[in-house]
Amino acid sequence: MCNIAGYIGYERAAPKLFEMMEKQEGLGGGFYTGIATIHQGKLYYRKVIGDVARLLDKTDAATLPGTMGIIHSRTKSGGDVEWGHPFVNEKENMAYIANGAGGFFEKIRNKDAIAQALSDAGHIFRSRTPGATGNYPRFSDGSSAHVSDVMCHLIESFILECGGPAEAMRKAFIEFPSEIVGLMIHTDTPDCIIASRINQPLMIGRDENSTYLATTAMAFPDLNWINPMPTTSTATIYQNSINILPFESIDYSVASIFPWEKSYNRVMTLLSNGSAKTLAELMKETNEFWPKNEVSQSAMMVYEILRHLKRSNKIRFLSSTVEGVDKDIDAPRTQAVLNRLR
């Protein structure tokens, strides 16, 4: 699990993005962090190994211009700084971030073949590394690249084929599915953020001047309108409107009925002895309640359970650090703990 966020509005995006990511990075990321904005037709991006604090300390990310942008915080799943998000194309006019994994689709998609075909067509992957890295796409020469780098270039290839970034992203998610959600910005469409979601969480929040996106609504400021993005769809998100187009011709289904009661009770049982639990630990203990023949929304549900418990003052979050990608760089960790009634 990673964490993502986006903002488009009247105010400068970078401070809004950092504020949202600092609220959620310990829940699912904190090991790599990157940001991208667009201003006056130019893409700006920065990324580091480490958390938001390190990105701000080691780069000029705090000064990036633009009133729209995206930000990502990644898990400890291998690779150097080029394996952090955002991923950009060679022209540096688009940036892509994602949260998720192969999951349900791991055995039915051919990520290696897609990566190799793009490489043969001349695409250059900045994350390409000699030898294998985990379960990431591999090329015929034995090297590997981040799967989101591959997706970034697949989207670019479809932009060249069908023209619009939104339709290209939609087509890429249909052809190369994973248990993911992704955000993209492109200099050809500087007035919108494009999102595609299969099953991983993405909440959308709005006020009178801006639209906010985040893995969890707990990252948002105080907003009156908050809703999840629909599954298996692509959204074009403007400052004052949202257009949603569903996927077509897919041969799988995403579970739409949440096992809320069973999962809520399991979460409360796990927290009842006073122990602190991470999001990943709570997800693992509730996975059994989802149907095996559908793609689950486990992360979305657990995030929403935690948001409900936090708003009703039944839990609090504890912040600590763990060893990061490098031994001298710590990563944030957030755990939920039950509040005891006095």
Positions of the model-derived regions?
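Conserved short alpha-helical segments that host acidic/polar catalytic motifs at enzyme active sites
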Residues: 1-342
